[in-house]
Structure formats: C-alpha cells, structure tokens
Regions:
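Beta-strand-rich domains and repeat architectures in extracellular enzymes and scaffolds
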Residues: 46-47
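SH3-family beta-barrel domains
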Residues: 2-39, 50-54, 61-64, 71-76, ...
C-alpha cells in the first residue's frame, strides 16, 4: 500500500495535522443533526457512536485523508468524515448554573445562568474567561465551567 505524501508521518510537524497542517488537538463542532463516529477512517468501518447534538463541540486528535479522529467531553468518539464538522467554535457548559457575567471578573454583575450541558457559541476568549452566547444571552463565563476551548487558548 502506498501512503500519500501528505499523510506520511515523516512529513508531519509535531502538534499539527498531516492533512490540514492545522494544530492538533483542536476544537470544532458538529455541523448537522447527527454524525457517525466510526472505528476507523472509512465507510467500511463499524459505527461505534452517533453524535446527536447539533453544534456539539468536539476535539480533533488525528487526521487521515478526509477523516478526523474526534472525541467529546467524555472521551467518546471515533473517526468522522470532515464534511460533518464545522470550524464554528462552540462550548458545552460543564458546571450547573454557570454564571454569565458582564465583564471577565468574579465581582462583575451576573447577567444570566446556564445549566450544565447547554451548548453555547464562543464570541471571544481570554486566558481565563470566554464571552459566549446562548439564545440571545451573552456574557463572560469562567473557562473552568466550559469544555471546547483549551485552557490557554485566546480567541479574538
């Protein structure tokens, strides 16, 4: 079997995908209503998991041709075709009644709260906080209450 030059391990930079040359791991979101996670990168591989939440954040950990190895916040996952994924940045709230604040400061006024499991759009992130949006509500939430962004990630 011949391996395409773009996927040879020797051609890959550490910490970057061999196919896209984008950082690994990185976060994306589920594009449609459902996405099959397969045991291996191809349609002939068994479906191990089905993601059913539109916009769900997923972590890409590997790439092979048109396939991306992804996992959810619980570590469940598999290989998903890249067309089922979006670069739109979303997070999932991991703390019950996470507080949306007016500014990225614990002394700031609480504008709203979100239940655990809510999926939110990322508007921007600082080292310890992200400004997110859910159903028209916007506010700053501590990163420790979110999954879908790296601890040190800054998003403008």
């Amino acid at each position: 079997m011949t391996v395409p030059a773009a996927t040879k391990a020797s051609d890959c930079k550490p910490g970057f995908g061999c196919v896209t040359n984008l950082p690994l791991p990185r976060f994306v979101s589920l594009k449609g209503d459902e996405g099959n996670a397969r045991r291996g990168p191809g349609l002939t591989h068994r479906i191990d998991w089905v993601f059913l939440r539109p916009g769900m954040p997923l972590k890409i950990t590997a790439e092979y041709e048109h396939w991306r190895r992804v996992e959810d916040r619980d570590g469940a996952g598999g290989w998903v075709h890249y067309s089922l994924l979006s670069g739109v940045r979303n997070v999932i709230v991991t703390l019950d009644m996470a507080e949306f604040r007016e500014t990225p400061d614990l002394r700031s006024r609480v504008l709203a709260q979100a239940e655990m499991g809510v999926i939110a759009r990322v508007l921007e992130c600082l080292p310890d906080w992200c400004r997110i949006s859910v159903e028209g509500e916007k506010g700053w939430v501590a990163k420790t209450a979110l999954w879908g962004v790296a601890a040190d990630e800054v998003i403008e």
